[in-house]
UniProtKB/Swiss-Prot annotation:
EC number: 4.1.1.23
Protein name: Orotidine 5'-phosphate decarboxylase
Enzymatic reactions: orotidine 5'-phosphate + H(+) = UMP + CO2
SUPFAM superfamilies, per database record: Ribulose-phoshate binding barrel
Annotated region described as Disordered, given as residue ranges: 311-333
GO biological process, one term: 'de novo' pyrimidine nucleobase biosynthetic process
Protein family membership: Belongs to the OMP decarboxylase family.
Length: 381
């Protein structure tokens, strides 16, 4: 049986065919950073979480969180932990994935997602769902995200400039006023002249001429379902990762279709139901948490993220059958070569392999390099 086309397509090419705007953005980010690594930041304090996000952010494309295990988590919409993570995501170029594993009736999971003390939807680009309660939970989460997004039908970006015109500018100003009335809307935005320039040569009455400054308001209107306008680093905005626009406001869902833990109950019927639910909600479901690619139909374009990834110690790093034992608590580990190169996943999720290293930043780079190598070798196979 021929491999699915997504296994041979580059991430850049898949960004062009993705059905979800956030998936398209993520593939672009992966291609730009040469990274398909997700850090599972399972740490006990908000301070540690923010520190890791800042230090390891350059190596990853996704940061996976468990907000409810973090002491010191604050929920202020502008200065809270989620808001600070969002700022670091902009700075270093990664998406935030809250590993909430919603698993209740539809009404309950929608409230957990859009409300409560944490307001997950406000700061997490991606969440996931356990399909045990059935497809209704996926539909309810999608509805909650849609209602949340409807509060932002478009972004209005406003800039105000105040200045005194030069003599050479009067002819151009006059032409522009003749061509377009103040406050007229054109294309992406509107430019309104609040105070017209007034130049008065009062030589006739013996008084000195004067110029009244112009206040100009510029507005740009942009759909939130599309990526935001690129910030120009040259203009001094260093808060956005260079080379790519800001992530869309659209929210995305990953369905927990398979697990890496020993003895889990996610059988073939469960996995198939997960795939069917994803196909029914392509406008919200980005893909899966799985152990292999689940793209089987020609139109399937889902992204796959896989936990349980670990490398042998560096001095023992060699190609094996891909298995690297377990942790004694049910977790089973495999190498990036097996998960991405052979099983066809797209993003390796790594936690303790990085967090427990003597130098987590250096180890994150080792995992990033190994996962990317597995992807590039898959393209050539």
């Amino acid at each position: 049986m021929a491999p699915h086309p997504t296994l041979k397509a580059t991430f850049a090419a898949r960004s062009e065919t993705a059905t979800h705007p956030l998936t398209a953005y993520l593939f672009k980010l992966m291609d730009l950073k040469a990274s398909n690594l997700c850090l599972s930041a399972d740490v006990p304090t908000a301070r540690e979480l923010l520190y890791l996000a800042d230090k390891i952010g350059p190596s990853i494309v996704v940061l996976k969180t468990h907000y409810d295990m973090v002491s010191g988590w604050t929920s202020h919409p502008e200065t809270g932990t989620g808001a600070q993570l969002a700022s670091l995501a902009r700075k270093h170029g990664f998406l935030i994935f809250e590993d909430r594993k919603f698993g209740d009736i539809g009404h309950t999971v929608e409230l957990q997602y859009t409300g409560g003390s944490a307001r997950i939807i406000d700061w997490a680009h991606i969440v996931n769902v356990n399909m045990v309660p059935g497809k209704a939970s996926v539909a309810s989460l999608a509805q909650g995200a849609k209602r949340w997004l409807e509060r932002y039908p478009c972004e209005v970006k406003t800039s105000v400039t105040v200045g005194t015109p030069t003599m050479d500018s009067f002819d151009d100003d006059a032409d522009s006023r003749d061509a377009e009335p103040a406050g007229a809307v054109n294309g992406m935005g509107s430019i309104g002249v609040l105070d017209k320039p007034i130049y008065s040569n009062r030589s006739g009455d013996g008084r000195k001429g004067s110029i009244v400054s112009i206040t100009t308001v510029t507005q740009q209107y942009e759909s939130v379902s599309s990526p935001r306008l690129t910030k120009a680093i040259a203009e001094g905005d260093e808060s956005l990762f260079p080379g790519i626009e800001e992530a869309p406001l659209s929210r995305g869902l990953l369905i927990l279709a398979q697990m890496s833990s020993q003895g889990n109950f996610m059988n073939k019927e469960y996995t198939q139901a997960s795939v069917e639910a994803a196909r029914e909600h392509k406008d919200f479901v980005m893909g899966f948490i799985s152990q292999e690619t689940l793209n089987t139909e020609p139109d399937d374009a889902f992204i796959h993220m896989t936990p349980g990834c670990q490398l042998p110690p560096e001095d023992e790093d060699q190609q094996t059958n891909g298995s690297v034992g377990g942790d004694g608590q049910g977790q089973q580990y495999n190498t990036p070569h097996k998960l991405i190169g052979i099983a066809g996943s797209d993003i390796a999720i790594v936690g303790r392999g990085i967090l427990k290293a003597s130098d987590p930043v250096e180890e994150a780079e080792r995992y990033r390099s190994a996962a990317w190598k597995a992807y590039t070798e898959r393209l050539l196979r």
